[in-house]
Amino acid sequence: MKVGKVSENVLKRAVFKQIRHRRKEVLVRGGIGEDCAAVDIGDDEVAVLSTDPITGAAKEIGTLAVHITANDIASSGAEVIGILTSIILPEGTREIALRRMMQEIEEVCSQLEIEVVGGHTEVSNAVNQPLITVTGIGKIKKSKLLSTKGLEP
């Protein structure tokens, strides 16, 4: 496969055809054009989740990572309440670079009233540039949930 996002046809054949719907609590599953999942957590509350990797960005990678994931969740009408970060750094990365990424992430989270609720950080020779994946968690009343499938700017 080529570098970049996997094509729609490959996603349909290799990913979505392999996934089965098992839980009635899952109201919306990710799919073509659907960036969020929605899970009924009771009392007319729905948890909205989305995850995005950031690759190839050298400047403000932490800022970009939070904004992209928060935007996905906000597009469903949900309030973003927290994020989990997975940061994989190439061998030789200096601690100051990691500190800057986390400062960017925390600055954006502060502006948006989002909490960093957890994550994972490691150095690996499997990557040659930083890879940040942010998973966002939001909440909304079930009756207010919007599907992002097919939305256009």
Language-model-derived ranges and their functions:
Residues 1-57, 76, 85, 103-117, ...:
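Extreme N-terminal cap/leader segments of soluble proteins
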Residues 139-153:
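Acidic/histidine-enriched ion/cofactor-binding microenvironments in catalytic or ligand-binding pockets
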Residues 37, 135, 139-141:
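Residues located in well-ordered beta-strands
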Residues 60-137:
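A glycine-rich phosphate/pyrophosphate-binding beta-strand-loop-alpha-helix module
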Residues 18, 23, 62, 94, ...:
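Residue-level detector of solvent-exposed, low-hydrophobicity positions
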